[in-house]
Each structure stands twice: as C-alpha cells, then as structure tokens.
Amino acid sequence: MSEESQTTWWSSNLTQRLLSGMVMVLVAILSLAYGTTQWVGLLVLVVVILGMQEYRAMLSQQKVHLNRRGWLYSAFFLSISPLLGGIGALNAMLILVAGGWILNEMVFSRKQQLEELHSLGWVLFGLFWVGWSFPHITLIKDLPYGELNLCLLLVVIVLTDSLAYFGGRKFGITPLATGISPKKT
C-alpha cells in the first residue's frame, strides 16, 4: 500500500511495527525474567546509548549540537554506574557527568552570551530523561519481585503506546510536533 492510498485507518507499516515490537518485547521479558542483573545492565547500556544518540540527533535538527564523544561517554558511565554501586553510584555519576557538561559549556566553550548556552539546558534534560532514568531498570531488577514489576511496567508502556498510536490514527485530526514527526496526530 502506498503512502497516498489510505484505504484503512491504520498505517502501511503496521505489520513491521508489530513484528519488531513483538521481538523487542520477547527479548525484554526473557531478559528480565531469566537474565542476570549484569545482562539486564548490558541491555540497558545499549538502550541508553541508542536513546541518547536519538535525542542528540533530534537536537541536531533544531541546530543544537552536542559533542558526540562526550555524549557517548555520558551514556556509558551513567549506564554502568548502577552495576558498580547501586543508586548512590548512579546519582553520583549523574552529578559528575552533569558537572562535566556544565564546566565544558561555561568554561571551555567559546560561547559569549547567555542565549548561546541554551544547549546546556537541553543537555541536562537529556541526561536526566534518558541517561539517568533508564539505568533504574537495573536497580529495580534486584528488588524483591523486581522482575514482575519490570514486566508490568513493560506491559503498561506497550499498551499506552499502542493505544496512543491507534487512537491517533483513528481519531487524530490536528498534527502534533510536526518538526519531530510530520504525520503524528
């Protein structure tokens, strides 16, 4: 089915989305249920690196450019810190990484005006949103009933995302965030 012919209210890539989603959910559930904390930590590392790279790419489209190497180091250190020392290590690493970005932007960059430092806000938001929140999966895994809690969290995320997708396709009229996703309603 071509992009122009809309004979159904769902998109032409629904099959691809369903297949890739089922594979990802299967890997996630098996990893959470049967994997060690280190294995889950490795998966979290991959997800955080990919997520932070996607966040960086979205910022690049808005003319906010981040140092690629520093961004990858930030993702790596934030992801492995729960394996090294739990929540304390994760929080300490967030402070160190955020402090490093602040120092870099305020001292070592050539930005002269306060308006030029808006990228720092986006960096700190991304570090917290992606880099700090996802490694908590590793910490939750070690809690009593942690595997069950993470599986339930995964089910809630999949259901809300799916319902939002189908609701947007069925009832959506007004475009939302066209700069990020031109067809999102």
Where is each model-derived feature located?
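Membrane-embedded alpha-helical bundles of polytopic integral membrane proteins
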Residues: S2-T185
